[in-house]
Every structure is written in C-alpha cells, then in structure tokens.
C-alpha cells in the first residue's frame, strides 16, 4: 500500500510536563500535537474501508521538507532534483517518532508489527510524507510458495 500525505513533516519535540500537587502530567507541545492529530485524520480517511495491518510489515517513509527561500535558483534546483539532501535539523529520528505515533492504530494495529523500517529526508517545493507499507510473509509461508 502506498500513501501520500500532503502535510509538512513535523519533528517530535521534547514532551512538556506540568505538576499539580503530587500529580504530574506529560504532554506533547502544541505543534507536535497538532501535527499528530492532522496526520491521523488524513490516515483515517485513506484507511476508510481497509483493514489495518496485523502481521509483520515493512515500512518505507520519505519525508519531503520545504526548500529554504534564501537560496539561489541554481541551488534550489539542485535540492528539488535530489542532488543535495537535507543534512540539517530536525533529525530524521524525530520525524520518524512523530509520524509513527500518529499512524499507530490507524494503518497498523500496533507499531510492534513494524519489523523493517527504511526512511529518508528530501527537499521539495510541496512538503509531504510518502509511506509504503508491505506485509511480510513469515518463513513458513515463504517455503510453501
């Protein structure tokens, strides 16, 4: 299954905590919480009428972030054509965390079903997240086919 979400990738920011008496509440910062809500809603629309993955899956995620406006046209072209990749923050692992959290329970029943994960960061004029999910056959099923 291939999915394209037209949403700007958002890093998982450090959780915030508030305390009231002996109770402490930990929560996502507003930007991260908004991103997770919006991505989850987009995924729910895509998954309408489809069954969630329950078995072992392989997931490939490509994060496309905006090209900075302060660069030359030549550099802009190099970035959008994939000759130059983003080596700046946010880190790839923070993109992964926020995205997998948002999609957990929507595309797959639990993120424990993800046994292979391939991710990458790219530049693009239209920020988005592209996801490919493949259900993997176990060794017993492979040997029978």
What is each residue range found by the language model?
Residues 1-145:
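Acidic, proline/glycine-enriched N-terminal capping motif
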